[in-house]
Amino acid sequence: MLQVLAPFYSNLSGLILLPLLGSLIILVIPNSRVRLIRGITIWTSLITFLYSLFFWIRFENDTAKFQFVETIRWLPYSNINFYIGIDGISLFFVILTTFLTPICILVGFYSVKSYKKEYMIAFFICESFLIAVFCSLDLLIFYVFFESVLIPMFIIIGVWGSRQRKIKAAYQFFLYTLMGSLFMLLAILFIFFQTGTTDLQILLTTEFSERRQILLWIAFFASFSVKVPMVPVHIWLPEAHVEAPTAGSVILAGILLKLGTYGFLRFSIPMFPEATLYFTPFIYTLSVIAIIYTSLTTIRQIDLKKIIAYSSVAHMNFVTIGMFSLNIQGIEGSILLMLSHGLVSSALFLCVGALYDRHKTRIVKYYGGLVSTMPIFSTIFLFFTLANMSLPGTSSFIGEFLILVGAFQRNSLVATLAALGMILGAAYSLWLYNRVVFGNFKPNFILKFSDLNRREVLIFLPFIVGVIWMGVYPEVFLECMHTSVSNLVQHGKFD
């Protein structure tokens, strides 16, 4: 049935516009019609997710060309077009975006107490911009949506954040990411004036001198490194996570952290191959420092969200090591780990959100002995804790294994230090689980709170299925991205 219908639903611009259409519909509905707003938002987000699956169904694994390409004239007096398409690298990021959005909306309806309609509109706009980022094949269009994502996220953190410092965290998030991206804008303008185009496919055939590649690479790095984030521009992330609502943390960890690493893969590495080789030792150094530093910092944290936030920094810098190994195994492993992190970290933030909804605190010392009062939660939390420490059979293990294989081929010392980071990751993951679920039982504090209800368990089920699926049968994902990754490596002559 899906195969028959798929040819009629393979329009990327329609996928981008669908969440915006949903936001326009609920915009005109009165705030008092809560059930109608909830129904429209949930169904719109689910339809968007199903719509994105049609692109996977129709995707041709054996071609490195961009598929479902659309070109719309944007600026008539210049060679800048609304140019979109997807390949094996971007496909799953689009699906991950549409997968997480309905979950965020469902969580928000029960956790957000004010401005619910505006909350849904903000998430729909954010989803639309994120899909456009992953589909953009024009540098300027990419930049526009890359920066536009900041607006709904700024509002989500600043309006629906959980504590008094939410405004400061929102401004910190906005300014850090915006200031870094100004350098990328200058680089894009330079490229346009030098080549007369911002079309990615044309630019991939354009050879820049080594000196220009280095300068342009640095400009793009200034933007993407903040989004990863890499040390020392990671300060905004823990604060943003702590202050953001649960659903905001899910989108932030699940999707927004992938924008920087995706930017490296889509633009920096293929457009500036000589500069990429030149700066690879620099990236390795920063990544190893970030993995070890943030892992040790995580062990010292007392806030549940900060623990997961710092672990996200470590995982994303593990991704950059695999990506800059510049071989097929490392890059495919980095993509898999990004997808896995999008599932595992999102689920962990949902676990923290479930505790916060009941106990109104995220401080570790107030928890202990939850296994006796919340056995279902304890089991689910254990599963995602094990996935976070890359237990074999889970999605994270496959990604990190391929990254280590690729990194050993490029630099065995870096791979060894990255493996040390995995050990530290296991240490803080088990420490966290032991303190929260076992430890000293605090009856006066937690006895009156209930276990997860049916709705909350159903929210976790898709994450469990995804983590097991990627961990047990990763070939489904690898075969889609392999041709595109191979073409990337061959194009840069990295072999």
From Swiss-Prot:
Recorded catalytic reaction(s): these are:
a ubiquinone + NADH + 5 H(+)(in) = a ubiquinol + NAD(+) + 4 H(+)(out)
Gene Ontology CC terms, in alphabetical order = mitochondrial membrane
Which keywords, in A-to-Z order, does the entry hold? Electron transport, Membrane, Mitochondrion, NAD, Respiratory chain, Translocase, Transmembrane, Transmembrane helix, Transport, Ubiquinone
What InterPro entries would the database entry show? NADH_Q_OxRdtase_chainM/4, NADH_UbQ_OxRdtase, ND/Mrp_TM
Coiled-coil annotation reads none
Query: Among the record's GO biological process terms, what is one?
Result: ATP synthesis coupled electron transport
Give the bilayer topology. Multi-pass membrane protein
Instruction: Kindly list the residue ranges recorded as spanning the membrane.
Output: 9-29, 37-57, 89-109, 118-138, 139-159, 173-193, 214-234, 245-265, 272-292, 307-327, 335-355, 367-387, 413-433, 457-477
Domain of life of the organism encoding this protein = Eukaryota
Record EC number: 7.1.1.2
Q: Which family does it belong to?
A: Belongs to the complex I subunit 4 family.
Q: Function, please?
A: Core subunit of the mitochondrial membrane respiratory chain NADH dehydrogenase (Complex I) that is believed to belong to the minimal assembly required for catalysis. Complex I functions in the transfer of electrons from NADH to the respiratory chain. The immediate electron acceptor for the enzyme is believed to be ubiquinone.
Matching NCBIfam families: NDH_I_M, PRK05846.1-3
Mind telling me what this protein is named? NADH-ubiquinone oxidoreductase chain 4
Q: Which organism is it from?
A: Marchantia polymorpha
Q: Which gene encodes it?
A: ND4
